[in-house]
UniProtKB/Swiss-Prot annotation:
<feature type="binding site">
    <location>
        <begin position="122"/>
        <end position="127"/>
    </location>
    <ligand>
        <name>S-adenosyl-L-methionine</name>
    </ligand>
</feature>
<keyword id="KW-0949">S-adenosyl-L-methionine</keyword>
<keyword id="KW-0698">rRNA processing</keyword>
<protein>
    <recommendedName>
        <fullName>Ribosomal RNA large subunit methyltransferase H</fullName>
        <ecNumber>2.1.1.177</ecNumber>
    </recommendedName>
</protein>
<dbReference type="Pfam" id="PF02590">
    <property type="entry name" value="SPOUT_MTase"/>
</dbReference>
<feature type="binding site">
    <location>
        <position position="72"/>
    </location>
    <ligand>
        <name>S-adenosyl-L-methionine</name>
    </ligand>
</feature>
<dbReference type="InterPro" id="IPR003742">
    <property type="entry name" value="RlmH-like"/>
</dbReference>
<keyword id="KW-0808">Transferase</keyword>
<comment type="function">
    <text>Specifically methylates the pseudouridine at position 1915 (m3Psi1915) in 23S rRNA.</text>
</comment>
<comment type="similarity">
    <text>Belongs to the RNA methyltransferase RlmH family.</text>
</comment>
<dbReference type="InterPro" id="IPR029026">
    <property type="entry name" value="tRNA_m1G_MTases_N"/>
</dbReference>
<dbReference type="InterPro" id="IPR029028">
    <property type="entry name" value="Alpha/beta_knot_MTases"/>
</dbReference>
<comment type="subunit">
    <text>Homodimer.</text>
</comment>
<keyword id="KW-0489">Methyltransferase</keyword>
<dbReference type="GO" id="GO:0070038">
    <property type="term" value="F:rRNA (pseudouridine-N3-)-methyltransferase activity"/>
</dbReference>
<dbReference type="GO" id="GO:0005737">
    <property type="term" value="C:cytoplasm"/>
</dbReference>
<keyword id="KW-0963">Cytoplasm</keyword>
Length: 155
């Protein structure tokens, strides 16, 4: 099974890339994690609707065929770490690839969010996109560690 993080925005600070790389290498062979960064639509004189629609096309092109789509959305379902661990366990049992999608500066296209299988919220706080990537991969690793009885997570 693969966890594919599809994120709008190709540039992240070095610290975020270092953190991403550190967590990505910790995952076991049977649970691969990969990042697909797609280009942010240039602003110009376009409306927000036009921007997120263009980004939607890039996101959809990056999605693995037949995957479960989970949109990160500020109005999505809030999760605890244990709830995320339970979701991860269910996803692994289904054995389909899961794409977790992080929108750009203007968020995700409303139609894309509506079509997603799930919408989740990582935090009530507004976070920089680079931080979201790191937070997401860390929480996915933590969820895996809970399910595997690995000592990384402590209650």
């Amino acid at each position: 099974m693969r966890l594919v993080i599809v994120a709008v925005g190709q540039r992240v600070p070095d610290w975020a890339q270092t953190a991403w790389d550190d967590y990505a290498k910790r995952f076991p062979f049977e649970l691969k994690v990969e990042l697909k960064a797609v280009k942010t639509e240039p602003r110009g004189s376009k409306t927000v609707e036009a921007l997120v629609a263009a980004e939607r096309g890039r996101i959809e092109a990056a999605l693995p065929k037949g995957c479960r789509i989970v949109a990160l959305d500020e109005r999505g379902t809030p999760l605890t770490t244990l709830a995320l661990a339970a979701k991860l366990q269910n996803w692994q049992l289904e054995s389909d690839d899961v794409a977790l999608v992080i929108g750009g500066p203007d968020g995700l296209d409303p139609a894309f969010k509506q079509a997603a299988h799930e919408r989740i919220r990582l935090s009530d706080l507004t976070l920089p996109h680079a931080m979201v990537r790191v937070l997401l991969i860390e929480q996915l690793y933590r969820a895996w560690s809970i399910n595997a009885n690995h000592p990384y997570h402590r209650e």
